[in-house]
Swiss-Prot record:
The gene is thiE. It comes from Bacillus cereus (strain AH187). This is Thiamine-phosphate synthase. Its cofactor is Mg(2+). GO terms for cellular component: cytoplasm. It catalyses: 2-[(2R,5Z)-2-carboxy-4-methylthiazol-5(2H)-ylidene]ethyl phosphate + 4-amino-2-methyl-5-(diphosphooxymethyl)pyrimidine + 2 H(+) = thiamine phosphate + CO2 + diphosphate; 2-(2-carboxy-4-methylthiazol-5-yl)ethyl phosphate + 4-amino-2-methyl-5-(diphosphooxymethyl)pyrimidine + 2 H(+) = thiamine phosphate + CO2 + diphosphate; 4-methyl-5-(2-phosphooxyethyl)-thiazole + 4-amino-2-methyl-5-(diphosphooxymethyl)pyrimidine + H(+) = thiamine phosphate + diphosphate. 2-[(2R,5Z)-2-carboxy-4-methylthiazol-5(2H)-ylidene]ethyl phosphate binds at residues 143-145, 175, 195-196. It is an enzyme of class 2 (transferase).
Amino acid sequence: MSRISKSEMSRLLSVYFIMGSNNCTKDPLQVLREALEGGITIFQFREKGEGALTEEKRICFAKELQAICKEYGVPFIVNDDVELALELDADGVHVGQDDEGITSVREKMGDKIVGVSTHTIEEARWAIENGADYLGVGPIFPTSTKKDTKAVQGTKGLAHFREQGITIPIVGIGGISIENTASVIEAGADGVSVISAISLAESAYESTKRLVEEVSNSL
């Protein structure tokens, strides 16, 4: 197995759904299934914060979500937990700046997908040099889902990464909705990552379909 190509990674980032059990008011397994039917291209398991599952329940829930992703042939990424990603044989892992360092993550994950959240050009260059396959850049807009977010960057912050010669695939993160998706793609992102735009939507399926349309119309 070799590392994922840049073009394939870019394609997979189009509509990147992130979810944990505490991000939904409906059955999360049904929400994920609807999102997959609607056309999400990659999924990240992020079981964190108030009311999140722990220990064995967390692992069992992750396995259920992973099995659904497999049915649809969509990559299953684990947030922040390299050991869990390895235990599940997940397709990859996504780490932040305060998590395990990219060098040791890449070493442990082999050729699997490794994504890194970055907020500065320096962080981006370090991540690229040490084996990141894609960057999560943000928060682009204010968000209520994450309590520990950095300063909002806006689409200008995202465009700055491209202006500084960062060519690796980028997914925009933070406060992204159907209404502002086009501006994120136009600023230079390959895709958008969302939590509540799908997880709290009246119809996860319809919301995902609209996100897919917005991205494809803007690329």
